[in-house]
């Protein structure tokens, strides 16, 4: 978190005198751990501006791995096996060179305040590095040799034997030592990395079983399905258990809770959401994957300063667990794209009844405009904080089209008495780095010695992200303020930022040569008894819940007019019937419709096996922009995760005919078997 220090009884801002060697416990919004020397203000500011702030190593490394996996799956079929091997080598190299297992275990233990046992540290580090070593040397080496000469019997035998040996090692570790009861939470990021590699191997076996001449009596498709279910449920259950254990009552409790939620989303849940795409039967083409979840960086403030009270322990801010959780996070909703912001400047000062103090202009309130996917009109204006006028308001424009991937802020604070618990905090400056290079600035006209704070996420190649390589974009900014009616000195204005993954597409673009996944929460409208509910942890975002007499509407942009098979990934709490329609851009009358009945898929918890796939129809778009609706006509609750578009060769009529023949043949075969 952000540590500060006062220069005199009225001024603030540097890092703590005693924390030069303190690890960055709460990543992504940290101070540079710099201490002001005996110099003047300009020297100190110059020193601060040279500071380099980076995210926690474990989360940063894993975020890069997620970017590589997304890129690999997006080119899985379009590229050659040689390219796939190269990507796999890149993932394993990232794991070993950055010692992912060790840094992730240390990070988790820092969050949950437990002393890590050396035996567990050694176990996780040595086992994952050992698995990656044989994965690279034995399996990928043999796979590359076979790919270069597939007719060579020796290479065929070698890759089959290497697969069986290495796969057995992964299976044993993932079923055994990684699930040690006392260290499940600590080892979860390590488990997830190993599971990711194991699933990629099983996918290869399904795809190349015949070419490798693997044993025909082993059903590798079933092995893969079983592993997907097991690994997904295990990761979600352990994550949920660890998160719930961190619930508390204080602001410090919330910081640990939010840090765990954010880092484990990056280290575990993002990969888990990608797991289903390793099924080559269901995903035979390259796949465009979108993650719609949000993560929240810590409020821009400070903790652990010996000289002044901090925002986690003062009456000037929301400083308890429940208030912070309510104010910082959003309830599940359709994806809202941040369009623009109007920022208002107020003042904080060190006012005392006997003498006036120093006034500092800070960000005191803002009004955000939000858009839904596929809509050009503002769907919501939301204000947090006050519309103060210490300075003229600042307008940050065109955020909707210019992704903001990085922030540079200046945090300021004052207090009436050194060591008092009435310290007041605020942000006097914030620069927004966007992909167009405009880098708009909010700047108070009353600057003050202040601490530079950078908030950023790594790209695939860059450690801090840049306009051409970034993984997250800003989706919301809020001011956190409390009722200050009884506080004469003013109140704190702390900034909270929310971020979403850069894979999310604001246009719902359907690609012509890839399977396109579109999260259900990118709809533009819900009507009737429909709502958005929290996802189970494995879906990469929230779900649309449809109850009796509800309608879900969403728009898409089709980059090439060709045939696509449309299917949904869903879970159903009871049997239900729904009607899906395709509409032209004019919306006068539907072009196509299909009615489906689905069976209930779960009754209690929404685990991996609760989600099913349903083919709706095959479409032949007449125009680039069109829309879909689903009307739940009867039955239980339907939970929609995503809608998928699969490119189809030939005419829609030919494809539907082929599908009907295959269904009939399967029914006949099942009849004779039974």
Curated annotation (Swiss-Prot):
**Which CDD domains does the record cross-reference, listed alphabetically?**
delta_endotoxin_C (cd04085)
Give the top-rank taxon of the lineage listed in the UniProt record for this protein.
Bacteria
Q: Which UniProt keywords apply?
A: Sporulation, Toxin, Virulence
Gene3D superfamilies xrefs:
Galactose-binding domain-like, Pesticidal crystal protein, central domain, Pesticidal crystal protein, N-terminal domain
Name any Gene Ontology BP term.
sporulation resulting in formation of a cellular spore
- InterPro entries documented for this protein: Galactose-bd-like_sf, Pest_crys, Pest_crys_dom-III, Pest_crys_dom_I, Pest_crys_N_sf, Pest_cryst_cen_dom_sf, Pest_cryst_dom_II
- Function summary: Promotes colloidosmotic lysis by binding to the midgut epithelial cells of insects.
Does rRNA processing show up as a keyword for this record? no
List the protein's name: Pesticidal crystal protein Cry24Aa
Task: From the UniProt record, list the coiled-coil ranges.
Answer: none
Q: Which Pfam families match?
A: Endotoxin_C, Endotoxin_M, Endotoxin_N
Gene Ontology MF: a single term: signaling receptor binding
Q: Which organism is it from?
A: Bacillus thuringiensis subsp. jegathesan
SUPFAM superfamilies, per database record: delta-Endotoxin (insectocide), middle domain, delta-Endotoxin (insectocide), N-terminal domain, Galactose-binding domain-like
Q: What else is known?
A: Toxic segment of the protein is located in the N-terminus.
UniProt family annotation: Belongs to the delta endotoxin family.
